[in-house]
C-alpha cells in the first residue's frame, strides 16, 4: 500500500478540505455501474482455467452467473447479466491525515515549517542542500562515480536509464528535486490533478512523459493560485 502527498488548495468562501477530498474516498459507495461486462469476466476466468486444471474442475459445472459471483464476489447484476459495482471509480484514498509523513513540509517566508499556510506566505526558494544532494545522487547512481570516504551508495529503486529518460540531465534532476512539489493537487473547485495513478508501495503508474510534464508545469498551480487561498499538505494512503 502507498502513502503520497497531496497539496489541497482551499478558499475561505468555498468548500472545506474534507469536502474537497470526500468525492475521492475509496469508501464512498456510488450508484451501481458496469465495471466489466460478463463476457470480459468470463474470458478472464477461461484464461486462468487453461493453465490450472484444479480451477477448471471447480468451475466446470457452474453456470456463468455462478462463475462470475465466485470470481468477483459480486452479487449485483443488471438485466443483461453484467456484474455491477458500487466501488467509487474516482477513488484516490482510503484514509488521510494532514501532514503525516510529510509533516511541516511547507516553508514560510518567516522561516517556519508548517502543514498549511496562505499561498502568499510560501517560501518557494529551492533548497540548496537538496540540490547538492541530488547532484551527488545522480553522480553515484547514473554516472557510476566512485564513493568518497564516508559515503554510502544511496538507496535506489530504478535503473539509471529511468533518470536519463525522465530528467535528461543532472542539473535538471537536481532542480526538480530541490523545488517544492507534491504527487497530486486538489483545487478549490474540487478538481484532482496528478501525473498518473498511485499503485502499491509508492510506485506511480504514470509514464515518463506524464511525469516529465508534471515536473515542468507544477509551478503553474502556485502561480495561478489566489494569494489568499490556503495550501495544506495531506498524507494520503491508498
Question: Which role fits each region the language model picked out?
Answer:
Residues 1-217, 224, 238:
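Acidic (Asp/Glu-rich) sequence patches and key acidic residues
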Residues 228-238:
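C-terminal or internal capping secondary-structure element at the end of a domain, subdomain, or sheet
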Amino acid at each position: 500500500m502507498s502513502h503520497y502527498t497531496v497539496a489541497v488548495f482551499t478558499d475561505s468562501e468555498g468548500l472545506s478540505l474534507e469536502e474537497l477530498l470526500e468525492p475521492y474516498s475509496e469508501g464512498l459507495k456510488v450508484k451501481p455501474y458496469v465495471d466489466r461486462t460478463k463476457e470480459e469476466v468470463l474470458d478472464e476466468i477461461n484464461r486462468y482455467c487453461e493453465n490450472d486444471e484444479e480451477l477448471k474442475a471447480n468451475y466446470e459445472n457452474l453456470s456463468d452467473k455462478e462463475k462470475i459471483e465466485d470470481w468477483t464476489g459480486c452479487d449485483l447484476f443488471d438485466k443483461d447479466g453484467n456484474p455491477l459495482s458500487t466501488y467509487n471509480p474516482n477513488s484516490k484514498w482510503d484514509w488521510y491525515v494532514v501532514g503525516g509523513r510529510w509533516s511541516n513540509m511547507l516553508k514560510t517566508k518567516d522561516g517556519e515549517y508548517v502543514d498549511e499556510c496562505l499561498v502568499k506566505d510560501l517560501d518557494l526558494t529551492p533548497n540548496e542542500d537538496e540540490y547538492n544532494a541530488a547532484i551527488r545522487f545522480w553522480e553515484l547512481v547514473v554516472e557510476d562515480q566512485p564513493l568518497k570516504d564516508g559515503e554510502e551508495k544511496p538507496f535506489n529503486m530504478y535503473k539509471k536509464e529511468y533518470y536519463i529518460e525522465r530528467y535528461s540531465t543532472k542539473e535538471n534532476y537536481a532542480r526538480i528535486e530541490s523545488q517544492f512539489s507534491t504527487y497530486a493537487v486538489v483545487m478549490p473547485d474540487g478538481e484532482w490533478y496528478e501525473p498518473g495513478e498511485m499503485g502499491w508501495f509508492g510506485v506511480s503508474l504514470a509514464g515518463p512523459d506524464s511525469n516529465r510534464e508534471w515536473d515542468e508545469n507544477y509551478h503553474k498551480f502556485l502561480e495561478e493560485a489566489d494569494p489568499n487561498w490556503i495550501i495544506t499538505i495531506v498524507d494520503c494512503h491508498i
